[in-house]
Amino acid sequence: MLAQYNPDIVGGSTGTNNLLFSQDYQASQGLNYAVSGAWANTAPHQADQLVSAIKQEADWESKWKLITVQFGGNDICVASCEINPFSEYYGDATPSGWRSNMDSVLSKLSTMPRTLVVFTESYMPGKLHDMVNPSWKCRLALFVGCSCITRENLAEKTQLRDDYTAELHSLAAHYRSSDFGVEVVPALTGLYPNAPAGGPDASYLAPDCGHFNVKLHSMVIILAFQYSRWIRL
């Protein structure tokens, strides 16, 4: 979408990952260093990779940079109920753990002048429990990929998502400067589109029901772009 307005933009992805959890860089990713299936505790490392790659670009200091960041779904779905203190993400899904990781991300990104960072609020995967007549793939995906959320604790997990958002707004206010902008946009609020029979519409979801398909990705991108037009510096 942005390239339609400025064909000189560089760094955008032109392909897809081969594997859901692949962390191997592929040239088609461009400057997209996001890792599918990642938790917030991996965000600082992704930020390091991105900053290093951007600083290899010609005239990187004088060019404006737009960076979008989306985390939280996996933290709410899996990490938020982890009780094993030896787990790699134990404690990171708390509001304070979330803030610490996102603070680290912004600290690294803020080393680059002329940068706009757009955080999308975390979406609420628990709404998938309301899907009418879900396929067996959807039921399995929820059981395996989102085991922390049940109908009984949905209000608690929704509050956790809201706490994440509050921490992002606090960090955004702290890091904004004359040449470094940070904004939090509700591009994922209200997901998912409803089906005629009620509940989330599976036609907007990937086969595993835990990820977006092209239609829903397009919807989110449009919403993020609309909100981003009002970014403040």
Predicted segments with their positions:
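Conserved SGNH/GDSL esterase-like catalytic core that processes O-acyl groups on lipids
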Residues: 1-100
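Solvent-exposed, polar/charged alpha-helical surfaces in well-ordered, non-transmembrane soluble domains
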Residues: 4, 45-48, 52, 96, ...
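Short, solvent-exposed loop/turn and secondary-structure capping segments
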Residues: 43-44, 78-83, 129-132, 194-195, ...
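Short coil-to-beta-strand
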Residues: 61-75, 119, 134-144, 180-184
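Substrate-gating cap/lid alpha-helix
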Residues: 97-99, 103, 128-183, 210, ...
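A short helix->loop->beta-strand "cap" motif at the edges of active sites that frequently abuts
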Residues: 112-116
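Short, well-ordered beta-to-alpha junction loops that form the rim of enzyme active sites
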Residues: 121-124, 185-187
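Histidine-centered active-site loop/cap adjacent to the catalytic His
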Residues: 201-233
